[in-house]
């Protein structure tokens, strides 16, 4: 939504709302869960400001800047949602590129700070990679790499997301990868898709 709203005032941004997406990919062997979008992306300073500060919410600041007519639901508006990733991951990497800017990678183990470095990334948007923790005697983190668990979490926490949420899956028998859409664009849910 941030990209769409910025495109209304920035004529350099060309946004086809029907091509915006959120994509998930899991790798059980490497214990990785990746969430990627082709949204607005973040600059180096935005990564530091929005992810490097607990309870700092760039989403909330964006939402507060809208007019009353611009009713919108924004994920992460309280600034602590992102940090819940460290409940299941021992390391989080965020790669992001904003239009017209360099791309950067933010990395943290959730314990003592973070690192940011410049990277090569041509596509605008953000990719978050969670390095899922190993199981312990009391916790089964494997479930966060199971398709049914991920699908249930998507439906529970992201039902209001306007854009499609897709997940790459691999058929264990054939090895073929497919892209399944869990939440389809629901035009009745959002008037912007009726244009």
Description of each model-found segment:
Residues 116-195:
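ATP-binding catalytic core of ATPases
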Residues 1-144, 152:
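GHKL (Bergerat-fold) ATPase N-terminal catalytic module, capturing the glycine-rich phosphate-binding loop
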């Amino acid at each position: 939504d941030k990209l769409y709203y910025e495109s209304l005032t920035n004529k350099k941004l060309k946004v086809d709302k029907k091509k915006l997406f959120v994509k998930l990919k899991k790798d059980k062997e490497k214990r990785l869960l990746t969430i990627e979008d082709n949204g607005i992306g973040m600059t180096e300073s935005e990564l530091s400001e929005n992810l490097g500060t607990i309870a700092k919410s760039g989403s909330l600041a964006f939402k507060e800047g809208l007019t009353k007519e611009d009713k919108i639901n924004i994920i992460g508006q309280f600034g602590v949602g992102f940090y819940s990733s460290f409940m299941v991951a021992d390391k989080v990497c965020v790669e992001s590129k904003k239009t017209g800017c360099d791309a950067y990678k933010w990395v943290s183990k959730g314990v003592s700070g973070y690192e940011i470095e410049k990277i090569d990334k041509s596509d605008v948007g953000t990719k978050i990679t969670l390095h899922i923790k190993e199981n312990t005697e009391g916790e089964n983190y494997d479930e966060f790499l199971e398709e049914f668990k991920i699908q249930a979490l998507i439906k529970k926490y992201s039902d209001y997301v306007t854009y499609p949420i897709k997940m790459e899956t691999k058929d264990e028998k054939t090895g073929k990868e497919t892209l399944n859409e869990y939440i389809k664009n629901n035009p009745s849910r959002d008037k912007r898709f009726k244009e």
